[in-house]
A protein has these predicted regions:
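Long, low-complexity intrinsically disordered regions enriched in small/polar
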Residues: 208-252
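Catalytic NTP-binding/metal-coordinating core of nucleotidyl cyclase/transferase enzymes
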Residues: 1-71
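A general secondary-structure signal for short beta-strands and their flanking turns/coil
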Residues: 2-5, 57, 97-99, 146, ...
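Catalytic beta-strand-to-alpha-helix segment of the class III nucleotidyl cyclase homology domain
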Residues: 69-77, 81-173
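Short helix/loop capping segments that flank catalytic or ligand/cofactor-binding pockets
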Residues: 17-18, 161, 199-200
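Non-catalytic sensory/regulatory segments that transmit input signals in bacterial signaling proteins
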Residues: 2-5, 46-47, 92, 246, ...
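A generic structural signal for well-ordered coil/turn residues at beta-strand boundaries
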Residues: 147, 184-186, 224
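Eukaryote-biased recognition of electropositive, low-complexity segments
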Residues: 165-220
Length: 252
């Protein structure tokens, strides 16, 4: 049965730049950081009992009760920043790095439907937000030793919980941006818990990261989750990279 839920998706910056042998370690660190941030935000039990979670390799998509939304807006971003900063020296010693983009949204989702749990417009939209150029830019143009995460919040969530006064954050702590990804064209709000800036993004002198081509998408384009294709306007990973239905699903 459909119900309004809070949606969280995180994605690691330059995940594919790591060696293949290190990818599992980095993904485990993503899980550890998110779990720690939830626990320190008063969402520990909520996270342990989450009914729908997709492990995407370079990130996580989770659907949580709507009641978790205020804590996901604050203090979760600050707690995630702290968890990633604490892990950085240990990862750096192994030649690894981890910074996360994150998107928050709310909407109608059926997270229990056996044949296609979690598939909805809200799920697609939160991943469009994650792929927003302003979100990528604000993280890439920050100091990698200072800023470990950047968030984008949907306009719906912002209006209800930030402008509506249901969190301790003020509207002035967010930056309004326009997100244009495929047919998605809506306003959203950036929030960086520990902002910083650099004159030139790291590795900019080497040019943009070259990504290996992924498998061809289904005829006519679309999003594939758990082997179920949602019609779209091009090959798009609902989670962060091009996939073909091979995501690992966890349901409790």
């Amino acid at each position: 049965m459909e119900a309004f839920r809070a949606l969280l998706v995180v994605d690691a910056e330059r995940f594919s730049a790591h060696r293949d042998v290190d990818l599992r370690t980095v993904h485990d660190e993503i899980r550890r950081a998110v779990k720690t941030a939830c626990r320190k935000s008063g969402l520990g039990e909520t996270w342990e009992n989450v009914r729908f979670m997709e492990s995407t390799g370079d990130g996580i998509l989770a659907i949580l009760p709507l009641e978790a939304a205020p804590a996901l807006i604050d203090p979760f971003p600050r707690r995630l920043q702290n968890a990633l900063a604490a892990a950085a020296p240990r990862l750096r010693a192994r030649g690894l790095h981890l910074r996360l983009r994150a998107a928050l949204h709310m909407g109608l989702v059926d997270d229990e439907r056996p044949e296609a749990p979690g598939i909805s417009t809200a799920t697609i939209d939160v991943n469009r937000l994650l792929d927003a150029a302003p979100l990528r830019d604000v993280l890439s143009r920050s100091d990698p030793e200072v800023t470990f995460t950047a968030f984008i919040v949907s306009a719906d969530l912002f209006a209800a919980y930030v402008a509506g006064g249901r969190t301790r954050l003020r509207e002035s702590q967010f930056t309004r941006v326009q997100v244009r990804v495929k047919r998605f064209d809506r306003p959203a709000y950036l929030y960086v818990p520990t902002p910083s800036a650099v004159d030139e993004p790291p590795d900019a002198a080497d040019g943009p990261e070259v990504r290996r081509p992924g498998p061809a998408g289904p005829s006519g384009g679309g999003v594939t989750l758990n082997g179920v294709t949602i019609s779209g306007d091009g090959t798009q990973n609902a989670i962060g990279n091009i996939v073909g239905g091979d995501l690992r699903q966890e349901r409790r």
